[in-house]
């Protein structure tokens, strides 16, 4: 797996970091603005430092420490870390890394070894008992230590804890095999581990005595829970310490730790152990911190009064760590103090002096910090941020009915923010206020207000009949307007985002939705993502599946399968319409048909013209084929189509070819242009296993088109609801009209350069299974039946849940799917934990359901989609002169090359890959959507956030930022003059603007 190549400003930053290391400045902060590719720079730094060490070091070791396993796996490819070295959730614990380190070293790493790690930052080594995998590995190593030869069973019981014996033994066997293989490969794993254990026990003899005493007890499992837990945690700490000692890195990269003070404060956490080892004890190890916000970038006066600490204290703490030298620290504090004093007295008449002081402070900071920013925001459309959400009768009723219930139960005021954030609150919320309501109702026994309410709870009966569920919430209605294009263009009929540069025009639902984008929603409340996922997906299903029910067979069509008629229930459970030979029609990558359609040769035509030309070629092919094979006309069947394609390729057919049915030319034309397998074959045609890879990817499309919601879409568009034989033909037509080849080619371009197999893996990971969320309905709340579940497919929720292997994998699957052209089209999330994750490939709409309290949090949210080659960049360039046909080989590479030549001029590569010039004729922009109610405080809060964002960079490292902001505001400064006071730490900008302070624009 190769790392991605850095662009010019990234290369300049990597060179600067290397220069600092050579000057013995071993601690460097890379604080590029969110979304500018800090990981790519880190990869370049790795290579440069490795080349530097090659003169005296025969093995270069890099430890990449990431705060989040999803971020780690996302960034492995960018760093060039082999897939086999990337982390599984179950093995991400620090105490398990000793085995991974030796396994990795045993592979053919030649000179350089990269070791990814994700410490459980919220997990204290003094609490819990660790994971079953963690304890199994400890036993698999420790039972080989001579002291425990006579205590195998009690040691196993101690570490088994409360895990099922059958699976416990299986886990131990698996690790025993890996240990034996690792020892055979390296020759020294077990001997090194035994030596390390001996050293530890010599330093902690009382701990060894305690473990042995436990093992001597007749019934280990009967010992007090606390004693066993403390013993297990002691063993975990021991193996974590051994892992740390075995790392011995030449370079440590710490990625996306948002608060440096939290990183170094953890006494017993895995992060704390790592921090002490690499940030405090080993002063000579090279450390690169990657974080746009290692300190709170902006503190309000309210935050300062609450905590006593804020931006200034955190900023100085980071700078003191980076300097790591008393003389350097003293010099920085003195220079920064002078700068702060002049800035606090900011006056237009003192401008020249202030610029000089700023330059001195900037130069001092540049000794250990690099930061590039993109200050141009021309690609942002903020018009929807000021649009007011209409207050409806239903909004008011949602509040009044809940407040009446609260009054009747003497429970005080119902939180108005909850009502503004979600409808049907008792269906979705799991907060304390609901518990109070439930408890009070159970005691009182009077449920009349709940029974009479139309807004507190969803009704299962209405959902089951696919009735329209009123939004009852202005914010949800705003989202529906965006996601479903106000029901004008049929966005609910899309299974993938229309190609930014289609190869031909159609009059289909895809052309009607040209420019359509996914929507990312941020909320402060955990209930909101679940509500959005459930109700938005239901609405999409109502507009498709429900439409079929309205058209025919309405009495049988039900949302909940168990309530459907017998025939409908069997149909849903058993029938997948693409199966057997009907599936093979769309999964066979016919090489002969692939040659009949070359997208760039027939580009920029109507689909009818493309079909006519390709159909002519198919007719010529079949005419010649009939003459040589003496075939007769037969009835159309999928088996005959598969046999014909295989015979055309010179392959042994899977079915006997009896003849060619009338109309086969039209079907083969559709397949040549849009078959998932044939489109995938064209994508992979340079690979040695192109056919196999194409079939592999096409299988994912079969699963997609066999989903209930997909089948409904095809039936709504093409009819033939009950004809499975016609279904595969309709699917092929849908793929043609959806410009599937252009969609796959664009998607491949966004995924970057890796190998064909890596591209296939990433594309396959972009299809996510339909999941469901549990909700309370009126019927379940009143005790009439169990809770119900809403399917989520058009929209999904991404929110804090119990962190385990299953939820982490689901989270990663959702991220991959949202970053693909395929569903889901709406992702709703809480802000927490999303730092560093990309959501930009097909999303240019961001909706702030609730405004954050800090202006920088808003910038961080939007950095999820304002990134390299984001959807808005591609859509604009594709629709410009740079995306005009003809092209020679690659639409997207040539589009970017044309744009670079015309637009870059004296700018860095931020243009055109991240930004476009202010005078670019934008047709598509990143849309900031803030659904605010009229007369609410949200408008004032939003205006203040915008004011602060415009100049907060000027308050960097200042003790009372909000007061300074007010001072600047009153002076009525010219914005161009203020920008010259911004701290410039960009190596590219400083080199290309003679050390001045001009920023990339």
Per-range role (PLM):
Residues 1-25, 40, 44-827, 831-1001:
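Helicase-associated low-complexity regulatory tails and linkers flanking the ATPase motor
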Residues 35-38:
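Conserved glycine(s) of the Walker
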């Amino acid at each position: 797996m190769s790392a991605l190549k850095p662009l010019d400003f990234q290369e300049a930053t990597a060179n600067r970091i290397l220069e600092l290391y050579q000057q013995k400045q071993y601690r460097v902060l890379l604080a590029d603005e969110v979304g500018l590719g800090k990981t790519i720079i880190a990869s370049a730094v790795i290579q440069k430092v490795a080349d530097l060490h090659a003169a005296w070091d025969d093995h270069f070791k890099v430890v990449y420490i990431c705060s989040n396993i999803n971020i780690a796996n996302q960034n492995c490819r960018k760093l060039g870390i082999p897939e086999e070295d990337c982390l599984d959730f179950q093995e991400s614990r620090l105490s398990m890394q000793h085995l991974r380190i030796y396994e990795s070293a045993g592979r053919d790493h030649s000179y350089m070894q990269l070791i990814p790690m994700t410490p459980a930052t919220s997990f204290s080594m003094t609490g819990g008992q660790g994971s079953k995998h963690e304890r199994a590995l400890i036993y698999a190593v420790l039972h080989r230590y001579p002291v425990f030869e006579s205590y195998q069973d009690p040691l196993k019981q101690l570490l088994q804890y409360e895990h099922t014996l059958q699976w416990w033994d299986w886990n131990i066997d698996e690790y025993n095999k890996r240990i034996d293989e690792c020892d055979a490969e390296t020759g020294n794993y077990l001997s090194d581990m035994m030596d390390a254990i001996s050293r530890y026990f010599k330093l902690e003899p009382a701990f060894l005595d305690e473990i042995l005493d436990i093992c001597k007890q007749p019934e280990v499992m009967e010992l007090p829970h606390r004693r066993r837990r403390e013993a297990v945690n002691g063993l975990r700490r021991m193996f974590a310490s051994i892992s740390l000692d075995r790392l011995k890195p030449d370079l440590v990269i710490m990625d996306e730790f948002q608060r440096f003070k939290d990183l170094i404060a953890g006494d017993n956490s895995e992060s704390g152990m790592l921090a002490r080892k690499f940030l405090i004890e080993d002063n000579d190890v090279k450390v690169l911190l990657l974080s746009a916000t290692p300190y709170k970038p902006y503190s309000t006066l309210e935050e300062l009064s609450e905590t006593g600490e804020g931006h200034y204290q955190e900023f100085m703490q980071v700078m003191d760590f980076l300097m790591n030298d008393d003389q350097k620290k003293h010099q920085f504090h003195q220079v920064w103090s002078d700068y702060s004093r002049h800035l606090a007295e900011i006056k237009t008449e003192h401008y020249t002096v202030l610029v000089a002081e700023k330059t001195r402070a900037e130069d001092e900071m540049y000794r250990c910090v690099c930061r590039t920013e993109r200050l141009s925001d021309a690609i942002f459309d903020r018009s929807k941020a000021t649009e007011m959400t209409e207050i409806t009768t239903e909004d008011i009723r949602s509040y009044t009915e809940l407040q009446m219930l609260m009054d009747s139960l003497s429970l005080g005021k119902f939180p108005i923010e909850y009502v503004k954030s979600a409808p049907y609150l008792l269906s979705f919320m799991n907060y304390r206020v609901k518990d109070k309501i439930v408890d009070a109702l159970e005691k009182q026994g009077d449920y009349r207000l709940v029974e009479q309410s139309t807004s507190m709870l969803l009704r299962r009966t209405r959902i089951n009949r696919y009735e329209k569920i009123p939004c009852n919430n202005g914010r949800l209605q705003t989202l529906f307007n965006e996601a479903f294009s106000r029901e004008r263009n049929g966005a609910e009929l899309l299974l993938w985002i229309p190609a930014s540069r289609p190869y031909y025009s159609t009059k289909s639902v895809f052309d009607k939705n040209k420019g359509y984008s996914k929507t990312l929603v941020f909320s402060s409340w955990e209930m909101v993502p679940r509500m959005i996922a459930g109700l938005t997906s239901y609405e999409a299903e109502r507009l498709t599946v429900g439409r079929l029910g309205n058209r025919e067979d309405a009495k049988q069509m039900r949302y909940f399968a168990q309530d459907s008629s017998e025939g409908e229930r069997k149909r849903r459970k058993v029938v997948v319409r693409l199966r057997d030979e009907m599936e093979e029609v769309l999964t066979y990558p016919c090489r002969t048909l692939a040659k009949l359609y070359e997208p760039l040769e027939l580009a920029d035509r109507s689909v009818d013209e493309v079909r006519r030309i390709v159909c002519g070629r198919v007719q010529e092919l079949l005419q010649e084929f009939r003459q040589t094979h003496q075939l007769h006309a037969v009835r159309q069947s999928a088996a005959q189509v598969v046999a014909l394609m295989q015979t055309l390729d010179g392959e042994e057919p899977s079915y006997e070819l009896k003849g060619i049915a009338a109309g086969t030319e039209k079907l083969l034309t559709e397949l040549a242009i849009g078959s998932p397998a044939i489109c995938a074959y064209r994508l992979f045609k340079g690979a040695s296993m192109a056919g196999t890879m194409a079939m592999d990817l096409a299988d994912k499309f079969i699963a997609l088109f066999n989903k209930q919601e997909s089948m409904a879409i095809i039936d709504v568009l093409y009819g033939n609801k009950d004809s499975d034989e016609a279904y595969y033909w309709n699917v092929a037509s849908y793929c043609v009209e959806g410009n599937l080849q252009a969609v796959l080619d664009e998607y491949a371009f966004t995924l970057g350069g890796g190998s064909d197999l890596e591209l296939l893996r990433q594309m396959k990971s972009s299809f996510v299974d339909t999941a469901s969320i549990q909700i309370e309905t009126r019927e379940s709340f009143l005790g009439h039946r169990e809770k119900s579940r809403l399917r989520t497919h058009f929209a999904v929720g991404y929110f804090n849940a119990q962190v385990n292997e299953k939820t982490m994998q689901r989270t990663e699957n959702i991220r991959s799917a949202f970053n693909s052209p395929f569903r889901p089209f709406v992702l709703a999330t809480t802000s927490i934990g999303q730092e560093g994750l990309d959501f930009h490939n097909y999303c240019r709409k961001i909706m702030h359901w609730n405004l954050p309290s800090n202006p920088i949090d808003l910038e961080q949210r939007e950095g999820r989609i304002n990134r390299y080659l984001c959807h808005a960049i591609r859509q604009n360039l594709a629709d410009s002169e740079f995306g005009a046909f003809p092209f020679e080989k690659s639409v997207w590479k040539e589009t970017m090359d044309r744009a670079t030549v015309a637009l870059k001029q004296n700018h860095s590569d931020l243009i055109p890959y991240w930004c476009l010039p202010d005078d670019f004729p934008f047709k598509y922009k990143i849309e900031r959507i803030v659904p605010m109610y009229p007369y609410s405080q949200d408008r004032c809060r939003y205006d203040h956030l915008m004011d602060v964002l415009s100049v907060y960079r000027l308050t960097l490292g200042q003790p009372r930022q909000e007061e300074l902001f007010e001072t600047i505001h009153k002076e009525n400064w010219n914005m161009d003059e203020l920008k010259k006071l911004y701290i410039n730490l960009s190596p590219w900008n400083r080199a290309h603007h003679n050390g001045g302070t001009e920023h990339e624009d």
